[in-house]
Amino acid sequence: MEFRLATIEDVNTLCELEHATFKNPWTLEHFSYELKENEFSKTLVACHNGLLIGYINYWIIYDQATINKVCIKEEFRRRGFAQKLFDLAFQEIKKEECMICTLEVRVSNHNAINFYLKNGFEKVVKKSAYYSDGEDAYYMVKGVY
């Protein structure tokens, strides 16, 4: 297993993985923006035998972190890759002295919700029709100390 910061050379693979995983995926342009222009954005990738198999994207804006995406290629799920990416991201989030970390997750994504609860997040509120397809989201928060 190898973990590293994403580079612009990863953008096509990130986009392919995104489109295979999410109902409303980020576009190639959005990934390019996150990697090249958004000064608050960080993307860590997980590689297995040289193959990019997952990533986490998060923002650190002053004393708040936001987890935007956690994605692992389907055949590599439940092997600890997401947890390792999460742990590495939180090392950076703590180092940057963030007070809280937030995220939104589809109410139907039970695996992700359980993962976030296991990692200390709490459901704060349900956001009605948060996603473009009308699905609700949970807004979840974790204190970072």
Give, region by region, the residue ranges found by the protein language model.
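Extreme N-terminal starter segment of soluble prokaryotic enzymes
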Residues: 1-3
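Conserved glycine-rich acetyl-CoA-binding loop
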Residues: 51, 70-87, 94-96, 100, ...
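Basic, alpha-helical helix-turn-helix
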Residues: 18, 27, 102, 128-129
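Conserved catalytic-core motifs of GNAT/GCN5-like acyltransferases
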Residues: 104, 117, 122-138
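Acetyl-CoA-dependent GNAT
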Residues: 5-75, 86-88, 92, 96, ...
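Positions that flank functional sites
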Residues: 33, 108, 131
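Conserved catalytic core of the tyrosine transesterase superfamily
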Residues: 41, 100-106, 136-143
